[in-house]
Amino acid sequence: MILMKDIVRDGDPVLRQVAKPLTFPLSDHYKQLAEDMMEYLVNSQDPKIAEKHQLRAGVGLAAPQVGEGVQMAALLVPDDKGEIIFKEVYVNPEIVSESVRQACLSEGEGCLSVDKVINGYVPRPDKLTIHYYTVDGEEKTIRLKDYPAIVSSHEIDHLNGHLFYDRINKKEPFALKEDTVVIS
């Protein structure tokens, strides 16, 4: 079971490196890693389990965040009522197209690897098309918009050595392009 002590924190070099692609079939180690990352997200969104194990709630977790420099990320995205609207483990994901129009979360973003609050809007594409493989090696291409697209972009950034605050406008953290969609 992944706990907060297992989450790599900002400053660790693995978070700033481009993760390596995985080859198929995945080894048992990487299959277990995918399971463990998803289990963390499920547990972190359950108030009783999260409190018992002192887990910070998360909607996404990338392999570099647990010290594994490989192209894998787990996503468990709820809607505003707590119902899961997107659940997947990406292996070797690639954003193949993105909208010109941007979106951001009204409250900004956070990250399990970043302990401090960093205020500001994090502009990301409003819509994404992502090509990836499942843990079983099935090739998929999906189109996402709004919150699932933002979470996917955040996690894929981790696989490319970027953190959310890299996208915040340093001079004007709450400045946005005119047609940016702000998601509450």
Swiss-Prot record:
Catalysed transformations (reactions): N-terminal N-formyl-L-methionyl-[peptide] + H2O = N-terminal L-methionyl-[peptide] + formate
SUPFAM superfamilies: Peptide deformylase (SSF56420)
Segments crossing the lipid bilayer: none
InterPro entries, alphabetized: Peptide_deformylase, Peptide_deformylase_sf
Essential cofactor(s): Fe(2+)
GO terms classed as biological process: co-translational protein modification; translation
Record has Iron-sulfur as a keyword: no
Broad class of enzyme this protein falls into: hydrolase
Name of the featured protein: Peptide deformylase
Organism: Lactobacillus helveticus (strain DPC 4571)
Phylogenetic lineage: Bacteria, Bacillati, Bacillota, Bacilli, Lactobacillales
Gene encoding the protein: def
